[in-house]
Amino acid sequence: MHINGPSGPQAYVNDSLGDGSVFPMGHGYPAEYQHMVHAHWRGFREAPIYYHAGFYIAFIVLMLSSIFGNGLVIWIFSTSKSLRTPSNLLILNLAIFDLFMCTNMPHYLINATVGYIVGGDLGCDIYALNGGISGMGASITNAFIAFDRYKTISNPIDGRLSYGQIVLLILFTWLWATPFSVLPLFQIWGRYQPEGFLTTCSFDYLTNTDENRLFVRTIFVWSYVIPMTMILVSYYKLFTHVRVHEKMLAEQAKKMNVKSLSANANADNMSVELRIAKAALIIYMLFILAWTPYSVVALIGCFGEQQLITPFVSMLPCLACKSVSCLDPWVYATSHPKYRLELERRLPWLGIREKHATSGTSGGQESVASVSGDTLALSVQN
């Protein structure tokens, strides 16, 4: 909670200590690090110990989950010949970005233990730089995955991107993540500072200057609006294409007086259109879950009522991004048929059981007459 007295923000009594002491946020920072604490945070009492404990436990779980899930993706996709396809390089790149984000978690755990950013300005810059590169890189990689799926499924013969094209897209994802990560690092435009419980760092969205407002607007469009628009457009066009394709097949089957032209049609299978919609919705919602909280907090902090941005509220976006980086490998890769087959073969103790490829699919390619429901559900069987 945030209050203002006659002379400005005042600290709350830290009830968690039970001794009536008054401790504002940042009081535990060493004297040489006090300049890092934005005046906004000093208007709040120190967070209760159980808040820190809750986030501490959550970050440990997320860190272990991210290392395991993304580590499996990188290991399987990089060592399996059947998975070394152009499209799968994008999934591998996403796992690398997600694992890169995980490198911040040990730093956070140390910060939460001592109560301040270990390493001072340099430690804060490194933490925020890692988060910026991995976050913006993952967002644009998600957009390129959506674009690749649209190209592949809408035109399975000539629409597949080549190795060279995919490598260029991957290089572009790292270039895309660089400008708005490096500019605040050198304080050319924007800057990094502690946020929330003052144990994490991000770009400054609290300083009310015209220059900083322009920075927040620009990074919002760059890291959120553009990738989200690309994802939405790609999956909308993909969904539209599949719907038209299924309608055409249904009309042709009616003319030929047969039930269906799809090679894999049966009463137990979910319709292709529904599976496409479900997969697209999951992917799109994950992106929104990851970046909408940060966008909302940053926009409110820069243009709205800053008193709404409490330490607890500003910690939620950080938790959301870390959570999605752990979910990505399961959404993007665990539903990949050939990936599941590799897991079943190499790690049978995971209990994964995947239907083996049938003769109806040659080399993992979709037939011209039909599109595999599993392929459309999440990933082309490359």
From Swiss-Prot:
Tissue occurrence: Expressed specifically in the retina. Each Drosophila eye is composed of 800 facets or ommatidia. Each ommatidium contains 8 photoreceptor cells (R1-R8), the R1 to R6 cells are outer cells, while R7 and R8 are inner cells. Rh5 is expressed only in R8 photoreceptor cells in a subset of ommatidia.
Name of the molecule in the record: Opsin Rh5
Biased composition (Polar residues): 358-382
Domain of life: Eukaryota
Residues on Extracellular side: 1-49, 113-127, 191-214, 303-310
Lineage: Eukaryota, Metazoa, Ecdysozoa, Arthropoda, Hexapoda
Coiled coil: none
Keywords annotated in UniProt: Cell membrane, Cell projection, Chromophore, Disulfide bond, G-protein coupled receptor, Glycoprotein, Membrane, Phosphoprotein, Photoreceptor protein, Receptor, Retinal protein, Sensory transduction, Transducer, Transmembrane, Transmembrane helix, Vision
GO BP annotations, alphabetical order: absorption of visible light; cellular response to light stimulus; entrainment of circadian clock by photoperiod; G protein-coupled receptor signaling pathway; phototransduction; response to light stimulus; sensory perception of sound; thermotaxis
N6-(retinylidene)lysine modification, residue list: K322
Organism: Drosophila melanogaster
PANTHER family registered for this protein in UniProt: OPSIN
Encoding gene (name): Rh5
Xref: SUPFAM superfamilies: Family A G protein-coupled receptor-like (SSF81321)
